[in-house]
């Protein structure tokens, strides 16, 4: 795992602040106090130690109890409410002791009631009529580019009259390209790994922790498994090591037959995408068709200073990190453009449906505008579908969980037994997506739709923890 830190140095140093010294300062201060003063006191008996321990526990209880008593677990003022949704902020506000309490409560197996709830819900879904196929079996390849931290707001944005993403901008204007600019990211603690979960299995991330870390070897329904029935081979390309985010295990659980890691070929993280695209093409050219290829990029991981030659080098912004983000986004866009050109040159472009989407938000739009509050609309990531055999309107809000059922439809695998917890963009668009905090984006005002989409988070958490789909395979 240490090897995966290569190239992260600038990012790590950029994240460190003086206030972070408080993490180690109490321990150092206590050791200094102990060495200087505690040895001067005479030895105590066990009763004194027990009294000190009891007093410490009572003091901790008096400090921590009000947050639990005065607030509901769903509120951010309650430790569990904040740890569930914004774990870093929760660490700062409530500390490690509250996190241990939270872990004891939530990192557990499923109760009988939870299992019954999930099983009943899934049985209801199975009783629905089979969906009608939207297209005939076309045997086109599927190439999915999962772009690290790519968001919608830089696309078609001019800064000092200059385009940040000329390649992606041009795609938004092509008639055979579907472009959704309002895709609400629904990742949680697993971030990029959660995005792979959403797109490949149609499930939402677990409530606590990262699915890839805690439940990597569970049984999952998936896009690769659905396509395998139709004769597809599934391949995943990673810039980093397969151990990062436990991707060796999840790749296998999701049904990918081949995995190529270290596609950065020794380049630093911020320059990884160029080699990912360069070295994946020869492999795809030799691969038996039809195939499903997932390419997971890395360059956009952090907004750091680079040596890229950019038209924004002299750009003056109050937040320099936003400038760095624009420069890296410009580079990533250029890499994607070159990859598409290569596919066209080699004859793979016309034989493939190409999907480009961001894995999660990072540099949200409010930071570019200098606003402190981050709205859900500031977090949107894009979705491009090139050579789409199906057409649909693209102006509504969708969630990342809606991509999986949409890909099943577009690839003619709509007969697969699990169609995910979202809705296909080719069948129904409710203009609603629910964030992991329970907030909803979009213009939908129907309580029943919003309530159902919120319920999907609870259902998915239970399905994953109870390993529900293992029983489906065994049957």
Describe the residue ranges of each PLM region.
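N-terminal secretory/membrane-targeting segments
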Residues: 1-140, 157-165, 172-173, 217, ...
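Solvent-exposed soluble domains appended to multi-pass membrane proteins
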Residues: 120-475
């Amino acid at each position: 795992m240490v090897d995966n830190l290569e190239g992260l140095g600038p990012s790590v140093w950029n994240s460190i602040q003086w206030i972070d010294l408080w993490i180690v300062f109490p321990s150092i201060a206590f050791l200094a106090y102990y060495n200087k003063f505690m040895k001067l006191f005479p030895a105590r008996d066990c009763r004194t130690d027990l009294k000190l321990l009891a007093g410490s526990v009572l003091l901790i209880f008096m400090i921590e109890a009000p947050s639990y008593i005065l607030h509901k677990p769903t509120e951010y003022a309650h430790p569990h409410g904040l740890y569930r949704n914004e774990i870093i902020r929760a660490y700062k506000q409530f500390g490690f002791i509250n996190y241990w309490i939270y872990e004891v409560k939530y990192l557990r197996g499923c109760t009988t009631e939870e299992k019954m709830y999930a099983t009943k819900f899934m049985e209801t879904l199975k009783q629905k009529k089979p969906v009608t196929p939207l297209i005939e079996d076309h045997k086109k390849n599927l190439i999915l580019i999962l772009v690290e931290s790519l968001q919608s707001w830089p696309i078609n944005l001019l800064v000092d009259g200059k385009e940040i993403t000329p390649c992606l901008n041009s795609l938004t204007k092509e008639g055979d390209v579907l472009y959704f600019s309002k895709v609400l990211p629904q990742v949680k603690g697993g971030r990029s790994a959660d995005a792979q979960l959403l797109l490949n299995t149609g499930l939402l991330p677990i409530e606590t922790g990262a699915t890839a870390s805690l439940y990597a070897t569970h049984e999952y329904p998936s896009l690769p498994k659905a396509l395998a029935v139709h004769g597809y081979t599934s391949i995943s390309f990673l810039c980093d090591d397969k151990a990062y985010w436990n991707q060796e295990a999840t790749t296998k659980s999701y049904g990918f037959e081949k995995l190529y890691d270290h596609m950065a070929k020794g380049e630093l993280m911020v320059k990884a995408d160029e080699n990912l695209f360069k070295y994946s093409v020869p492999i795809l050219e030799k691969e038996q068709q039809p195939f499903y290829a997932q390419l997971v990029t890395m360059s956009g991981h952090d907004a750091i200073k680079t040596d890229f030659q950019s038209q924004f080098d002299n750009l003056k912004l109050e937040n320099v990190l936003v400038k760095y983000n624009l420069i890296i986004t410009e580079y990533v866009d250029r890499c994607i453009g070159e990859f598409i050109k290569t596919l066209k040159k080699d004859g793979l472009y016309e034989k493939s449906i190409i999907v480009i989407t961001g894995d999660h938000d990072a540099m949200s739009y409010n930071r570019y505008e200098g606003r402190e509050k981050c709205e859900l609309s500031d977090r949107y990531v894009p979705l491009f579908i090139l050579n789409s055999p199906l057409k649909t309107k693209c102006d509504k809000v969708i969630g990342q969980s809606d991509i999986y059922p949409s890909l099943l439809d577009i690839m003619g695998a709509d007969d697969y037994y699990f169609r995910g917890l979202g809705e296909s963009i080719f069948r129904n668009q409710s203009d609603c997506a629910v964030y992991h905090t329970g907030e909803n984006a979009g213009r939908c005002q129907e309580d029943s739709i919003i309530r159902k989409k919120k319920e999907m988070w609870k259902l998915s958490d239970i399905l994953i923890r109870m390993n529900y789909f293992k029983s489906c395979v065994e049957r």
